[in-house]
Amino acid sequence: MLPRAIDFHVHLPTPDWLDGSMAGYVEAAEAYFRSPVQRSTLDDLADRYRDIDVMAVLLAWDAETATGRPRVPNETVADACRAYSDVFTGFGSVDPRKGDTAVAEVGQIAAAGLRGVKFHPSLQAFAPDDPVYWPIFAACQEHGLIALFHTGTSGIGAGQPGGQGIRLDYAQPIRLDPVAAAHPGLTIVAAHFGWPWHMELIAIALHKTNVYLDISGWSPRRIPPEVTRELRGRLSGQFLWGSDFPFLTPERCLAEFDALDLPADVADQVLRGNAARILRLG
């Protein structure tokens, strides 16, 4: 039986991500989200999600080449998903700038039972529309893995001189259009709906049904009305609910999503139905 909701965007609130991969970035992100990150053990995280009847999609992380910071290994997420299989599923991550190593790791992610691959073009400093990276996306398609891309602005580096060297243009949604066109069998999820280029992403999703949008990283009550209009209407089958924990809490995101007062069938699609379909759950 499916849970009440599936949180499509959950980072590990543990030291390996917050103090390792995110070292030097957390303070700016906390200021951007106007909220302290909530640190947690995996035991406590699992209990938290059980208590609200939500499944969490845990995300690995690998931006070693661009940031010089350690990765969250795919094995860490796979182990957590096995240990807490009632409440966690997960995505691996590859560093696109590692070339053939990244391509090989896609197969390892699939073999580990993970459901997709997480990319952060701005932190990984790569342009998804550069065909040099397309063997990675072809491998995702071959193995039936979802490709989840950060899109739009980023709380990481926000409000800092030079944005801590992080380029937002790498995460502009239009860069995903040629990827989706060249890989029609690849399910692409554009996280955070690409603001401030959200209309660009809406156009892509209307044109290409293999492109989905997640609403994580946003207080639902602050989602732009043009995005909410498409969520209620033409794109209700391509939106995914998520929190971006530990920056925003699932409890808050659920409560504010409920307050949007969507039709029951649309709310169910966005909260769990669309995610369950592309994750092949239930």
Enumerate the language-model features and the residues they cover.
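Active-site gating/metal-coordination segments in enzymes
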Residues: M55, A63-A158, R167
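Catalytic pocket-lining loop regions of alpha/beta-barrel enzymes
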Residues: R115-G116, D129-L240
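A cross-domain feature marking catalytic cores of carbohydrate-active enzymes
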Residues: V10, A60-W61, G92-P96, F119-P121, ...
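Active-site environment of divalent metal-dependent phosphoester hydrolases
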Residues: P13-D16, A63-A66, P96-D100, T153-G157, ...
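Conserved, mostly hydrophobic/aromatic
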Residues: H9, V77, C81, G90, ...
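Short aromatic-enriched loop/helix-cap "lid" or pocket-rim segments at secondary-structure transitions
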Residues: D16-M22, P70-R71, V103-E105, G159-G162, ...
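Mid-to-C-terminal alpha-helical segments outside catalytic/metal-binding sites
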Residues: M1-D51, M55, G107-Q108, L235-L240, ...
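Alpha-helical scaffolding within the catalytic cores
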Residues: Q38-A46, V72-A78, A102-A104, P173-L176, ...
